[in-house]
Design a protein with these regions (language model features):
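Terminal low-complexity tails and localization/encapsulation signals of metabolic enzymes
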Residues: 1-3, 247-260
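C-terminal long alpha-helix characteristic of the crotonase
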Residues: 123-128, 179-227, 234-235, 240, ...
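Conserved CoA-thioester-binding segment of acyl-CoA-metabolizing enzymes
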Residues: 1-54, 91
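CoA-thioester-processing core
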Residues: 89, 93-95, 103, 109-163, ...
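Glycine- (often His-adjacent) and acidic-residue-rich active-site loop
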Residues: 55-90, 108, 138, 221
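Well-ordered beta-strand positions
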Residues: 121, 160, 164-166, 172, ...
Length: 260
């Protein structure tokens, strides 16, 4: 199926979603709604085991919200509904049952940075830049940045970035834990795909359990988080993949996981 704002390619159990809104891949309301529909399809598709989210071109992952739409936000109730819709979408990405890798090919600013923070893992080109510059427009991050950035890098560093509206380099993003890997720009697409392919070969049920335990558990007190882990572990232990994994270990062969 063809999409208006995104390109979707599936290969070797990996779905590559490309934000295709030149020149800077802004996230319009229509684009965000479309992204939700894409996630609907990919979640149901058993041939897809991991996802890559990236931007078209070589300069920008996403510059964030389409500021031209702000004037048509309407009253408080309408604006609150719009923000809630975005929060729900980004929460869905964060809780997606299959690994989601942000492949950051350039600038990730504002909502674009908040989008990549909602992904499970992130790999960036060495020329990429990150920022939440909303304060310079007299507003503030509203797509989850005030909540996810402190959880990823710590409160004081997050406040510094948001209060100053500063940009940071890919190398600094790596050093503070905002991304997992930084690679030369010309190798980004290949490295992201190989990483996603490696994850796609893993046990789907166990990976879903890990994601749920980490994301949901981190929002709870430790005893409740451990309860989430316990419930997921008990479910995973009963799968065919668990039996296969143990058998492969003792047979000294590579396991073949089926997601059952």
């Amino acid at each position: 199926m063809e999409w208006k704002h995104f390109l979707v390619e599936i290969r070797d159990q990996v779905a590559r979603i490309t934000i295709n809104r030149p020149p800077v891949n802004t996230l319009s309301r229509d684009a965000l709604i479309e992204l939700g529909s894409i996630l609907d399809q990919l979640e149901k598709d058993p041939s897809v085991r991991s996802l890559i989210l990236t931007g078209a071109g070589e300069k920008t992952f996403s510059a964030g919200a389409d500021v031209s739409e702000f004037g048509g936000m309407g009253d408080r109730e309408q604006a609150e509904g719009f923000l809630k819709q975005i929060h729900d979408l980004f929460d869905r990405i964060e809780n997606f049952p299959k690994p989601v890798i942000a492949s950051i090919n350039g600038k990730a600013l504002g909502g674009g940075n908040e989008l990549q923070m909602a992904c499970h893992l992130a790999i960036a080109a060495d020329h990429a830049e990150f920022g939440l510059p909303e304060v310079r427009l007299g507003i503030m991050p509203g797509y989850g940045g005030t909540q996810r950035l402190p959880r990823l890098i710590g409160q004081r560093r997050a406040l510094e970035i948001m209060l100053e509206g500063k940009r940071i380099s890919a190398q600094e993003a790596l050093e503070i834990g905002l991304v997992n890997k930084v690679v030369p720009a010309e190798r980004l697409a290949e490295e992201a795909f190989e990483w996603a392919k490696q994850l796609a070969e893993g046990p789907p049920v166990a990976m879903k359990g890990i994601i749920q335990s980490v994301i949901n558990g981190s929002r709870k007190e430790l005893p409740e988080g451990l309860k989430v882990e316990r419930e997921n572990m008990l479910a995973v232990m009963r799968t065919e993949d668990a039996i296969e994994g143990v058998a492969a270990f003792f047979s000294k062969r590579k396991p073949s996981f089926k997601g059952k």
